[in-house]
């Protein structure tokens, strides 16, 4: 999501929007997953995004119908485009044909970031999901929409995945008064994984004179002018074979590495040995070569040491740079209870020097996140699961929402509360209650939450496998029953999660309020009532010394005679 400023100076960083460096995508190809799924994760991170599950039912429209386009970020009206006669069912960012689209915003060159088109990046995602059946078709439709109606956002990286293929598409507008965009899309090789996190990542590629969309041998698509436009704008003067999309249209800088690429590094490091060679780069040390291009960047994709499951994906989304020198649990910013979160802004200055707060994958301002699981060996009627969640990925639970459901569970439905309208009936608010309470004493409280996350996640994985065995037996005979079954299951799982998290908050608040840790005890014989066991944990010696030094002895016990 929005918005990153290129050529960042620290003063500009201080002025960055509330949504800076938002969103993370991890992409797993069929050959890299434990069961042959294609998977893609997405965290929609914004201080002003309310977490809810969008739904567009499949519909038939009269010929000539027009579709209003409203900017996803702001709600601003952008214009109208022709509607197609038939649209598809979309649940969040996954449709009924097992197509999923996610994104992260890299913004790119400022002069290219103010086009006056109709199609913003959010509308491109959700309109395309209603119209496309495969990743290749989605790339064609999305780029055609931009060409026909103009682009209305800054630079974007899109993850476009179906049950067989996973693609990365990077796109940026042409600036004020210029319609369309320049773009390139690459197929991730099977058996590999990729990621992006608010920094453009496609570098060199084999330029295509023609996009033969449905030729399986073509693994690169691009706009005709992706290189010539860069020459026209005096961004590039080398050979076509040397042209790097990212280094030309969104050169990586300190912020792009430290706040963005470091999240890609954390994922890559979790799945493949040897990633320490890119650690200096991820921290923000950029080396430059010909054309000013960075020379020490990470590869666009890597082959993992072992195959990846959806349970692994849930874990990757909870990363806080644990185990690295930037592990946020270990410095003074963590407070006395090892909190791996830092409140914004991410940049600050003192005594004439500039500093940063780290930006990890899991962050407090997430509106919603998901892992799309797309499975070619299952019928589309129940082949795709949108493992959907709300709030901070570090504290959330991913609930299995089949992409064909037609009834969205009430706790996750659009219109059930908003960012300034609290309700206990909303999963977003209940999960925020738990996470925000846990931030106060992370070391003590989070382990209890983690147990509940694992219990629910393993239960959901087991239950979906059992359900799908049953559905395989009936899907050809009774498709209506299949639809009823997936609706019932996803709604039941969501309602159960919502209630369990309300119960969890009640348990945690009762146990940990007022700085104590209370344990219920049985009432002994002969007693009318009995107080709970109360424990009070001392601060670490490190924090005791910090207090002593900061208070300059004022808190020292005065001994008689002193």
Language model regions located:
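Positively charged n-region of N-terminal signal peptides that target proteins for export
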Residues: 1-5
């Amino acid at each position: 999501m929005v918005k990153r400023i290129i050529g960042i100076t620290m003063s500009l960083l201080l002025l960055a929007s509330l949504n800076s460096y938002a969103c993370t995508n991890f992409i797993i190809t069929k050959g890299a997953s434990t069961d042959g799924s294609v998977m893609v994760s997405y965290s929609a991170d914004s201080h002003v995004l309310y977490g809810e599950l969008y739904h567009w039912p499949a519909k038939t429209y009269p010929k000539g119908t027009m579709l209003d386009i409203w900017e996803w970020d702001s709600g601003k009206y952008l214009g109208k485009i022709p509607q197609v006669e038939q649209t598809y069912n979309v649940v969040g960012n996954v449709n009924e044909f097992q197509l999923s689209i996610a994104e992260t915003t890299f913004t790119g060159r400022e002069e290219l970031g103010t086009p006056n088109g109709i199609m913003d990046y959010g509308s491109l995602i959700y309109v395309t999901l209603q119209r496309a059946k495969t990743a290749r078709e989605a790339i064609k439709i999305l780029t055609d929409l931009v060409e026909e109606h103009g682009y209305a956002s800054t630079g974007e990286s899109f993850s476009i995945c179906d049950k067989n293929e996973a693609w990365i598409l990077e796109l940026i507008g042409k600036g004020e008064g210029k319609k369309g965009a320049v773009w390139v899309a690459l197929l991730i090789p099977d058996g590999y994984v990729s990621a992006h996190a608010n920094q453009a990542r496609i570098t060199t590629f084999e330029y295509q004179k023609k996009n033969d969309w449905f030729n399986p041998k073509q693994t690169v698509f691009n706009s005709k002018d992706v290189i010539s436009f860069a020459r026209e704008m005096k961004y590039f003067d080398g050979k076509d074979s040397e042209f790097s999309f990212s280094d030309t249209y969104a050169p990586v800088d300190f912020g792009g590495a430290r706040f963005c690429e470091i999240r890609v590094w954390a994922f890559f490091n979790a799945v493949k040995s040897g990633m320490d060679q890119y650690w200096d780069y991820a921290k923000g040390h950029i080396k430059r070569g010909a054309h000013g291009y960075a020379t020490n960047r990470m590869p666009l994709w890597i082959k993992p040491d072992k195959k990846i499951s959806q349970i692994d994906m849930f874990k990757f989304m909870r990363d806080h740079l644990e185990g690295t020198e930037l592990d946020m649990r270990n410095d003074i910013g963590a407070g006395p209870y090892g909190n791996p979160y830092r409140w914004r802004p991410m940049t600050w200055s003192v005594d004439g020097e500039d500093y940063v707060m780290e930006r990890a994958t899991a962050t407090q301002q997430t509106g919603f996140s998901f892992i799309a699981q797309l499975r070619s060996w299952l019928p589309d009627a129940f082949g795709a699961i949108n493992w959907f969640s709300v709030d901070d990925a570090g504290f959330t639970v991913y609930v299995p929402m089949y992409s064909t459901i037609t009834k969205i569970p009430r706790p996750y439905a659009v219109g059930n509360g908003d960012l300034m309208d609290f309700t206990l009936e909303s999963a977003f608010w209940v999960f925020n209650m738990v996470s925000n309470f846990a931030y106060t004493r992370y070391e003590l409280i989070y382990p209890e939450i983690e147990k509940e996350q694992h219990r629910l996640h393993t239960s959901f994985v087991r239950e979906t496998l059992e359900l799908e065995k049953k559905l395989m037996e009936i899907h050809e005979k009774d498709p209506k029953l299949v639809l009823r079954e997936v609706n019932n299951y996803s709604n039941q799982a969501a309602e159960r999660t919502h209630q369990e998290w309300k119960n969890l908050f009640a348990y945690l608040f009762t146990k940990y309020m007022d700085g104590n840790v209370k344990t219920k005890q049985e009432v002994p014989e002969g007693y009318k009532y009995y107080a709970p066991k109360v424990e009070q944990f001392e601060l670490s010696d490190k924090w005791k010394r910090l207090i002593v030094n900061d208070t300059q002895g004022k808190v020292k016990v005065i001994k008689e005679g002193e």
